[in-house]
A protein has these predicted regions:
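Structured, basic alpha/beta domains of bacterial-type, RNA-associated proteins
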Residues: 2-95
Length: 95
């Protein structure tokens, strides 16, 4: 199994519970496809480098997980359609 890091930029204008629900949904998607979430890091609210959907700030989350090589594509496909996620990036971590 490979190690991956999924970075989520979540809408800053939503309530805390909605933001937590978006992160939980991302974790659920990872586990649904056979991945194991090892760590979730909340980096807090940060200013965006450029405006996204008329927003200047977003909450950053880093989700570390282990999975087979086919899982990141499935995860990205589902996260792409989540309403409260402004941007995402899934990268393979070095061993």
């Amino acid at each position: 199994m490979n190690k991956y890091e999924l970075t989520l930029v979540v809408n800053a204008k939503i309530e805390d519970d909605e933001r937590a629900a978006a992160v939980e949904k991302a974790k659920e998607i990872i586990t649904r496809f056979g991945g194991t979430v090892t760590e979730v890091e909340d980096a807090g609210k940060k200013r965006l480098a450029y405006e996204i959907q008329k927003m200047k700030e977003g909450f950053y989350y880093f989700i570390h997980f282990e999975a087979e090589s086919t899982v990141p594509a499935e995860v990205e496909q589902r996260i792409r359609i989540m309403d409260n996620v402004l941007r995402y990036l899934c990268v393979k971590q070095e061993a």
